Amino acid sequence: MKFNITSGELVKALSAVAGVVPSKATLPILENVLFESVNGHLRLTATDNEIYVVEQVEAEITQDGSVAIPARRLLDTMRQLPDIPLSFDIDDRCIVKFKTDRGAYKLVGAKAEDFPSLPSVLEGTTVVIDTDSLTSAIEKTRFAVSTDDLRPNMMGVYFQVDEEKTRLVATDGHRLVRLIKYNMKGDIPVNFIIPDKALAQVTRTLNGGETTMQITKHHVRFTNGDAEVIARLINESYPNYENVIPKENEKIMTVSKEDLLATVRRVSIFSSSTTRQIRLNLSQNEVSIFAEDYEMSSEARESVKCQYDDEDMVIGFNARYLADVLNNVSNVDVTFAFSTPNRAGIVQPLDQEEDEDLLMLIMPVMLNTQG
């Protein structure tokens, strides 16, 4: 195999796929990137056997072929080079040689046939969506995904696709996000869970234009221009999340997202490093945020103007979880809907963005003092 390419183009393509390469793989071949000549282009593929990332790049192919090349060493070398022309020459023993106008380098590759084949994702449900809308939806939900290995069904974002809309749901038991996208529709209804790691790779790989999602029983494929991400789905049943969303929430507070978020971040510095507990005291058109740390004999209190005309109420939250929820609402003002201090609070943007309906839920914490 022989080809010519600039180091700038190669480092861009390598960076797009290398994020999935395991640093210490049980199968040594997975520490490589597969290089293939396909229809006059150079195609790069990387995988950890759960996620596959494919990137195609322009190159001058002078001899067709394929080879697996150590990913880290090649990428580290490319990053240290200026944007200059490179000539690659790979022989039948998988010896990889490449030259610049200044020097020559040699690596030992591996046979392409030892590299895992891409899963077949040919049939199933198809969804076509604007890429920016898709990546925005992923970012608004995946922050709430569980990291608990004992609950694998919650370690991804749950997609419910039908002919009219798609629901994306994520929860870790403390927070829950339900995002309905009306501009994201499937030709066949289907429900599936995509692992968080795969979605993180999707947001790094996809760039502009439209993205096509193809969903089969075991895999999902994202295609965006010359880039492709294939991921194995989580083969578990998702919890019945609708049951935990309170239906009657008569206490409504509307507040500036930025004002409340900044206040929560400041006051939480004084909260217990163990519980991260803060207290919200709701009163007429004002919410007071209070935190204290017994061990350090420190406390903080700030008030924020809001719209609230119900009876006074005190409710506690984990400061980090509350900040995460607020940080993932892009609108100016948010509404909080409460029923009682021991039931979940619902957070929504005052004005929903076009073609979507965002609902976030945060569980309260047991208050241990009266602040």
PLM features per residue range, with description:
Residues 1-371:
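Structural preference for solvent-exposed beta-strand-turn elements
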